Swiss-Prot record:
Descriptive protein name: Small ribosomal subunit protein uS12
Ribosomal protein among keywords: yes
Entries under SUPFAM superfamilies matching the protein: Nucleic acid-binding proteins (SSF50249)
Keyword check for Ribonucleoprotein: yes
Length: 124
């Protein structure tokens, strides 16, 4: 335990939390422009062609964002919204594309978990 005199000379340093999504600058989402849309392979033991986009954000950051759902309409110069959330089997991918916002269309014919994929309610 530190003495009062020690604390007067050098106060306790506050704990600093490190963020997992530094490019968001404490915002819930950020807008950006796709600079490259491509597929990449996950790390072992998984195997797939995961759809990702390289995005230049409005604050100048350039990040890699995962495009969830089956099929997408993104290409270079598409304006998209990204949110936090990493993809465990893709190293360096710490952001998700928000489906159904700005230039990114929602997933067509999606019936369940529609809100996560920007899909409208089907006409019963």
């Amino acid at each position: 335990m530190a003495t009062v005199n020690q604390l007067v000379r050098k106060p306790r340093a506050p704990k600093v939390d490190k963020t997992n999504v530094p490019a968001l600058n404490a915002c819930p989402q950020k807008r950006g422009v796709c600079t490259r849309v491509y597929t990449t392979t996950p790390k072992k033991p998984n195997s797939a062609l995961r759809k990702v986009a390289r995005v230049r954000l409005t604050n100048g950051f350039e990040v890699t964002s995962y495009i969830g759902g089956e099929g997408h309409n993104l290409q270079e110069h598409s304006v998209i919204l990204i949110r936090g959330g990493r993809v465990k089997d893709l190293p360096g991918v710490r952001y998700h594309t928000v489906r159904g916002a700005l230039d990114c269309a929602g997933v067509t014919s999606r019936r369940q978990s529609r809100s996560k994929y920007g899909a409208k309610r089907p006409k019963s």
